[in-house]
């Protein structure tokens, strides 16, 4: 459930970032924000399925007769986003674009822009890793982006947005 919570917090960041970066780039920021909403929404759905539906199915599978187990294996539902383009790809593109746009904002730290662009690329690595069937890209993205740099960027960006809103 922690991933579901993190994704819901990501949706809140999209709203705040949209307001922060909209001036001078309204159409672009609105467009990538919609992409982020789609990505985070699908991520949330996938994570809920992982923690709720799949364990329940596993319980039924273990208790089922062999014929039913075969049927359950054959009827395994397809993931909502098997390539991760709509989830990690869309969110990564949003992170990349808002941080690229932030370079032109005088009150936005340059190091945060660079860190954010790297985080965006690492999100996109998940989709590329799935498309190219290269587990190493997914592992790099999960380790470096998901555990280390992503949380640092989100925290720093959140502090900056809070300062801008409540100086």
Spans of model-derived segments:
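Hydrophobic, aromatic-enriched alpha-helical segments typical of multi-pass transmembrane helices
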Residues: 1-167
């Amino acid at each position: 459930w922690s991933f579901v919570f993190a994704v819901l917090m990501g949706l809140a960041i999209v709203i705040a970032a949209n307001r922060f970066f909209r001036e001078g780039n309204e159409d672009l920021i609105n467009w990538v924000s919609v992409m982020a909403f789609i990505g985070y929404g699908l991520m949330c759905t996938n994570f809920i399925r992982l923690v709720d539906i799949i364990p329940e199915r596993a319980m039924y599978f273990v208790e089922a007769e062999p014929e039913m187990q075969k049927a359950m294996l054959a009827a395994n539902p397809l993931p909502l986003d098997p390539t991760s383009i709509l989830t990690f790809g869309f969110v990564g593109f949003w992170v990349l674009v808002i941080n690229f746009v932030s370079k032109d904002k005088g009150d936005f730290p340059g190091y945060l822009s660079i860190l954010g662009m790297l985080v965006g690329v690492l999100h996109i690595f998940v989709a590329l890793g799935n498309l190219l069937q290269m587990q190493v890209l997914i592992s790099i993205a999960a380790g470096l982006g998901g555990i280390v740099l992503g949380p640092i960027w989100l925290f720093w960006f959140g502090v900056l947005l809070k300062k801008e809103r409540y100086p």
